[in-house]
Amino acid sequence: MARKSIIARNERRKELVEKYAAKREELKKAGDYEALRKLPRDSSATRVRNRCVLTGRGRGNYEKFGLCRNMFRKLALEGKLPGVRKASW
């Protein structure tokens, strides 16, 4: 499991992205890159990492489910993900 501080940092970044989204878009359209540069670094969407909602794992995530591959497999085999079943042909 990822450290709690890493998960918390990512959550703060998500909040900043949401807070500054409209302003960033407005500045981009105006071409005011100097003002864009003065915004907080973490308000850029590229700094947000997709993480597993259960474990906080930062790699191997299925965006549709919000889970890492390990938790996805575990929950799918337990039948806890509706509409998901093991392939067989």
Curated annotation (Swiss-Prot):
Keyword 4Fe-4S: no
Any Pfam family the entry gives: Ribosomal_S14
Superkingdom: Bacteria
Gene Ontology cellular component list: cytoplasm; small ribosomal subunit
Record carries keyword rRNA-binding: yes
Gene Ontology molecular-function annotations: rRNA binding; structural constituent of ribosome
InterPro entries xrefs: Ribosomal_uS14, Ribosomal_uS14_bac/plastid, Ribosomal_uS14_CS, Ribosomal_uS14_sf
One GO term (biological process): translation
Keywords for the protein's UniProt record, in alphabetical order: Ribonucleoprotein, Ribosomal protein, RNA-binding, rRNA-binding
Cross-referenced SUPFAM superfamilies: Glucocorticoid receptor-like (DNA-binding domain)
PANTHER family xref list: 30S RIBOSOMAL PROTEIN S14 (PTHR19836), SMALL RIBOSOMAL SUBUNIT PROTEIN US14M (PTHR19836:SF19)
Subunit structure: Part of the 30S ribosomal subunit. Contacts proteins S3 and S10.
Cited HAMAP family: Ribosomal_uS14_1
The protein's role, per its UniProt record: Binds 16S rRNA, required for the assembly of 30S particles and may also be responsible for determining the conformation of the 16S rRNA at the A site.
Protein family per UniProt: Belongs to the universal ribosomal protein uS14 family.
Name under which the protein is recorded: Small ribosomal subunit protein uS14
Species, as recorded: Chlorobaculum parvum (strain DSM 263 / NCIMB 8327) (Chlorobium vibrioforme subsp. thiosulfatophilum)
